[in-house]
């Protein structure tokens, strides 16, 4: 018989830097999950990613206090800010432009995000990422 699921916990943790401090500790501790076991497993799973990039993770907690987790790709906004070399998006994206991204950069970001996007083709994924860039106040070139 399958284990009973008690909770889904969604967090954003920096790749390779999970530790028992907030937000990880309190979120797992209140469910009675082993915090250090998660930290070690998460850090091992994200060891190939660039350290420090925020990585969304969905933790499934079971009634016997075990867990499984799935990592997602880094949010598009973080990748776009990094590509454009800006620290934050524009407060008024329609009038104030804060940076530029090229078509090539959009394609690279779309390839990274490909598994998490619903787009059927790379071109559709690029258009989705370009829309995110425009809504952040970035100019899309190409």
Curated annotation (Swiss-Prot):
Record note on modification: One or more lysine residues are methylated.
Keyword Ribonucleoprotein attached: yes
Gene3D superfamilies listed in its UniProt record: Ribosomal protein L11, C-terminal domain, Ribosomal protein L11/L12, N-terminal domain
Keywords for this protein: Methylation, Ribonucleoprotein, Ribosomal protein, RNA-binding, rRNA-binding
Superkingdom per UniProt: Bacteria
A GO molecular-function descriptor: structural constituent of ribosome
InterPro entries reported for this sequence: Ribosomal_uL11, Ribosomal_uL11_bac-typ, Ribosomal_uL11_C, Ribosomal_uL11_C_sf, Ribosomal_uL11_CS, Ribosomal_uL11_N, Ribosomal_uL11_N_sf
Pfam (any one): Ribosomal_L11
Biological-process GO terms, alphabetical: translation
CDD domains: Ribosomal_L11
Record-level GO cellular component terms: cytosolic large ribosomal subunit
Family recorded in the similarity comment: Belongs to the universal ribosomal protein uL11 family.
Job description of the protein: Forms part of the ribosomal stalk which helps the ribosome interact with GTP-bound translation factors.
Subunit structure: Part of the ribosomal stalk of the 50S ribosomal subunit. Interacts with L10 and the large rRNA to form the base of the stalk. L10 forms an elongated spine to which L12 dimers bind in a sequential fashion forming a multimeric L10(L12)X complex.
Protein name (Swiss-Prot/TrEMBL): Large ribosomal subunit protein uL11
The organism's taxonomic lineage, starting at the top: Bacteria, Pseudomonadati, Pseudomonadota, Gammaproteobacteria, Lysobacterales
Recorded name of the encoding gene: rplK
